[in-house]
Amino acid sequence: MPQYLVANYIPDDFDPSSVTEAMMEEIHALNREMIAAGARKFACGIAPAGKAKTLRKQPNGKVLITDGPYTETKEHMGGFWILEAANLDEALAWAKKAAIACDVPGEVRELLFFPAPEQGSGKSK
């Protein structure tokens, strides 16, 4: 069954103290619903973009590490779920609930494996 990333985005100036107890309970309720449906595989919030590090391979083969996110934008990923869903429509239905519970914009992307990890590389040793 396909898996999907359901991400939510928060503004750079997001204040965690603005999250109410009611909002947290709505998010917890959504997580419980996802678990009961067998859809949720993983979920978490992530540190603010200002604490991110970006890594880029250089022409000399070394890796340059810099402060901050890769892209410059006013919104950054604030958390995400990994969901198993029958199709994109089912993943979008969960994402709509997430957008309501978190009160922030979101994004859905199918996770791709070439080939799927359980299938191996298909190459013999």
Question: What do the PLM-derived regions correspond to, one by one?
Answer:
Residues 1-125:
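Conserved, structured core segments of small domains
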